[in-house]
């Protein structure tokens, strides 16, 4: 129980972040991760820390909950080991690490933390060892033995060939003339070294990793009588150039150098700050079409967006990445910076050829691919390699490709590839015009669309916007993914081909032979004007077969009661436009009759009052029509006596329906119920 309470307290502290804790001063991310490691070792006794070691390497990490349970660092499996926490040691015959390390001077503490090579090089200088053993309050960021061994031979030779100048200066650059613990190491701060007051950069990341000039702290906060020792994984060197100066002197940045100058971003890259530049090399330009590169280089706004997409808002050293991390660029896009083994990745791709090139105002990683943001792309480039490639091919075949690669302000409504699983339509005049109505004559953003808004298309149609609780639709087609906003155009990914409206609801019903009996009934009850005027209706239209399927007694009863017929017709008309993509699981739609219809959708099959819909989303200028194969009954239907006047009128409307049916279906015999009804009404 005690362990659970402590874990809960730690979880709350991690959730609150470094800015606040439940009690006492805020803990740094490093301290929180160290505390997590202490809690994980309860069964091993006090002062034991759990450490994750990457299999096959000497790399060890104090880790947070996520990494603990995943048992991976940069995609590589780890094993858990248990070591004495910083400042403690084992006692022979005792479990855990009960004894505090005795304090020694800085020089001796170097040996305790495993930096004996630093001790050795300190011995070679005339002045440094006496300082480390004498009175004072210094901090040294001491390279590990492996860090010294990994230095290029020519660099190491230059240091040891002049120990009292080069080597001494290098060691002093790792030192600060005061005591500095990790709780003082703030992200982005600069510490002044003991070498000519040169500065080095500190970065303290939310995952608890602390770096000094991108060298990771391996063991931190080892106290000495005259200071503090931190063990780091690299030998650090002075940094004198800002990001812009490095771009100017590196041969591999010729194209980048010209682009920065043309965009005016050189001022930013010279300024104070802590940026990460993902710097494209000359080779990166070879991986995109020359036409695309020239277009962007010739467009100041697109060029600036492109470069801003390569600049992260904060400095990110490679050693701080142990898993995928979303980072924001100056373009306000997000890139996933991750790792795979020793390789740094961007959006899952290992495109970084050189990492952790330090500048006074940040860090540079060389990349061999351009990261082109959506805001610098044409419509066709936005769609390249996406789930709408079939639609893009159709636009090209229809001769509309110039609209997708030009500088018109447009919005493309592109159906998903899955829409064409049964085959794409042939390119004819009808398809060409239909595709033109999938291009809006304005560059839109879905977040600014509103219910009832009308949009003008290249094909001359006006399309309506419908906003529902869980969907945003344009006519019968709903947006299936976040829109992509390009340089001039925006791409909306749609869940089906769009059908522009043609005619009123009444026009739609009259134009479809399936609804001749319904049309006759509507005309008799004088509802034609309602369904012809401006409005917003959802009509569940019973087909002729639906009326014919009624029992003879039911049909007679319906025709013998004017009010009941009117109520039933109005019950089939909803008071708003509801396309199938806006239904969700269940929608209760108020009808013109007053009662509500229960409209539901499951696995793309629509039903109303649990009756299946035969065809959905027949669009009209004032509504939408659904074909249904049953006649819906209001929940409180009260039959009334039929009058003689109704009988004559009923005969007339069904004569009209019969004539219409004969004209359109001369070779098809009417259903027996329908025939008997017509015969009866002649007498």
Swiss-Prot record:
Gene3D superfamilies per record: FAS1 domain
Keyword Secreted assigned: yes
GO BP: cell adhesion; extracellular matrix organization
Domain spans labelled FAS1: 103-236, 240-371, 375-498, 502-632
Segment forming the signal sequence: 1-23
Domain EMI, first and last residues per copy: 45-99
Record-listed Phosphoserine modification sites: 37
Database matches in InterPro entries: Adhesion/Biosynth-related (IPR050904), EMI_domain (IPR011489), FAS1_dom_sf (IPR036378), FAS1_domain (IPR000782), TGFBI/POSTN (IPR016666)
GO cellular component: extracellular matrix; extracellular space
Post-translational modification: Gamma-carboxylation is controversial. Gamma-carboxyglutamated; gamma-carboxyglutamate residues are formed by vitamin K dependent carboxylation; this may be required for calcium binding. According to a more recent report, does not contain vitamin K-dependent gamma-carboxyglutamate residues. The EMI domain contains 2 expected intradomain disulfide bridges (Cys-49-Cys85 and Cys-84-Cys-97) and one unusual interdomain disulfide bridge to the second FAS1 domain (Cys-74-Cys-339). This arrangement violates the predicted disulfide bridge pattern of an EMI domain.
S-cysteinyl cysteine modified-residue sites: 65
Keywords linked to the UniProt accession: Cell adhesion, Disulfide bond, Extracellular matrix, Gamma-carboxyglutamic acid, Phosphoprotein, Repeat, Secreted, Signal
Localization (cell): Secreted; Secreted, Extracellular space, Extracellular matrix
Motif (Cell attachment site): 642-644
S-S bonds: 49-85, 74-339, 84-97, 214-317, 473-478
MF (Gene Ontology): cell adhesion molecule binding
Main location class: secreted
Domain of life: Eukaryota
Tissue spec: Located primarily in the epithelium of normal adult cornea, in fetal stromal cells, and both endothelium- and stroma-derived cells in healing corneal wounds. Not expressed in normal adult endothelium and stroma.
Function: Plays a role in cell adhesion. May play a role in cell-collagen interactions.
Subunit structure: Binds to type I, II, and IV collagens.
Protein name: Transforming growth factor-beta-induced protein ig-h3
Lineage per the UniProt record: Eukaryota, Metazoa, Chordata, Craniata, Vertebrata
